[in-house]
């Protein structure tokens, strides 16, 4: 069940050059697109792929208008990648299958939980006492929302997400550990997406807070009492330790780590595999990974790095020494 180009432009805008009645049967990347597909060009460096592509139509920026015109139908959009993102939403809605039961029969929902009439609860989900699920929110299979935790409106939680497990709180005593009961909850804002098997721990006393528009990838760990600001995005395997505060509009590459009790300002972008060991007070891009190398060179560089302080002191001493004439 395809979509005509005219219908796409009518719904999303853009400047169409080509037959509005042309039907698109699939969306595909430039290099793999067939004559019934629509694709997009997000960066001029892929212009060679544009010329070679078999796609029926391509979304391009204004600067690529001439290159696109030489190969067939195209749609001009100020931001082709954003246009394509909205197109995927239109495409999914157009091809949506009939909805099954709003609440799957295998889901377990406590009588004292509050689930909005428009929310959807998937197979084997658990919603515990006092939890609240907002309008239009979707819980995929095997999601757990623990006691008193709140999920806002229009959220999407993928399979295996756990909201409100106990935070990691322990007090040492005579060589053993005494559990600190986690008495807070988790509060998730509106329009939040949480990837598969991500865990967000409940607070020890205050709540763990995920603000509106946050996007979390798969396999992320958010510790107790963390606060994540609006529209921050984190890629897979990020870990945020307890009581860290993350600002708004930040991004974290895959495998990045934030140590506990630190503050990260708004607009900070942390590269993949970076370990944040101190608070970041100023917006910008931050990277803290050790460059990859063949093992022999890596070991030599690592050994040198261990001596960096002593080498610095020797250099300072040499700089202070009287110069021979």
UniProtKB/Swiss-Prot annotation:
Q: Which GO terms describe its molecular function?
A: N-acyltransferase activity
UniProt cross-references to CDD domains, sorted A to Z: LbH_LpxD (cd03352)
Give a GO cellular-component term.
membrane
User: Which UniProt key words apply to this protein?
Assistant: Acyltransferase, Lipid A biosynthesis, Lipid biosynthesis, Lipid metabolism, Repeat, Transferase
Record: active site: 224
Catalysis performed (reactions): a UDP-3-O-[(3R)-3-hydroxyacyl]-alpha-D-glucosamine + a (3R)-hydroxyacyl-[ACP] = a UDP-2-N,3-O-bis[(3R)-3-hydroxyacyl]-alpha-D-glucosamine + holo-[ACP] + H(+)
Indicate the enzyme's highest-level EC class: transferase
Could you say which EC number(s) this protein's record lists?
2.3.1.191
The record's listing under Pfam families reads: Hexapep (PF00132), LpxD (PF04613)
> Which pathway does it operate in?
Bacterial outer membrane biogenesis; LPS lipid A biosynthesis
Question: Mind telling me which InterPro entries this protein's record contains?
Answer: Hexapep, Hexapep_transf_CS, LpxD, Trimer_LpxA-like_sf, UDP_GlcNAc_AcTrfase_non-rep
- Which Gene3D superfamilies does the annotation name? Hexapeptide repeat proteins, MurE/MurF, N-terminal domain
**GO biological process assignments:** lipid A biosynthetic process
Lipid biosynthesis listed as a keyword: yes
**Protein task:** Catalyzes the N-acylation of UDP-3-O-acylglucosamine using 3-hydroxyacyl-ACP as the acyl donor. Is involved in the biosynthesis of lipid A, a phosphorylated glycolipid that anchors the lipopolysaccharide to the outer membrane of the cell.
- Give the protein family: Belongs to the transferase hexapeptide repeat family. LpxD subfamily.
Q: Which NCBIfam families match?
A: lipid_A_lpxD, PRK00892.1
Query: What interactions and quaternary structure are annotated?
Result: Homotrimer.
> By what name is this protein known?
UDP-3-O-acylglucosamine N-acyltransferase
State the organism of origin. Variovorax paradoxus (strain S110)
């Amino acid at each position: 069940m395809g979509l005509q180009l005219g219908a796409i432009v009518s719904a999303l805008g853009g400047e169409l050059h080509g037959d509005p009645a042309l039907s698109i049967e699939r969306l595909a990347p430039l290099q793999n697109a067939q004559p019934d597909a629509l694709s997009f060009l997000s960066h001029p460096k892929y212009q060679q792929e544009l010329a070679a592509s078999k796609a029926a139509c391509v979304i391009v920026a204004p600067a690529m208008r001439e290159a696109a015109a030489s190969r067939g139908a195209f749609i001009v959009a100020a931001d082709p990648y954003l246009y394509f993102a909205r197109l995927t939403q239109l495409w999914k809605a157009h091809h949506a299958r009939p909805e099954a039961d709003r609440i799957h029969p295998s889901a377990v929902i406590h009588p004292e939980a509050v689930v909005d009439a428009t929310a959807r609860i998937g197979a084997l989900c658990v919603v515990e006492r006092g939890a609240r699920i907002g309008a239009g929110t979707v819980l995929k299979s095997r999601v757990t929302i623990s006691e008193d935790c709140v999920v806002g409106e229009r959220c999407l939680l993928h399979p295996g997400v756990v909201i409100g497990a106990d935070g990691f709180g322990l007090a040492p005593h005579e060589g053993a550990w005494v559990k600190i009961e986690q008495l807070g909850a988790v509060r998730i804002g509106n329009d939040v997406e949480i990837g598969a098997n991500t865990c967000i721990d409940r607070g020890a006393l205050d709540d763990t807070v995920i603000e509106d528009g946050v996007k979390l990838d798969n396999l992320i760990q958010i510790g107790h009492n963390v606060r994540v600001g609006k529209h921050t995005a984190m890629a897979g395997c990020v870990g945020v330790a307890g009581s860290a505060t993350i600002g708004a509009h930040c991004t974290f590459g895959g495998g990045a780590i934030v140590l506990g009790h630190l503050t990260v300002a708004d607009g900070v972008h942390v590269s993949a595999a970076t370990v944040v060991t101190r608070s970041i007070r100023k917006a910008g891009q931050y990277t803290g990974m050790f460059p990859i190398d063949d093992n022999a060179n890596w070991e030599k560089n690592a050994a040198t790095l261990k001596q960096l302080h002593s080498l610095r002191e020797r250099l300072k001493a040499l700089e202070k020494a009287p110069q021979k004439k």
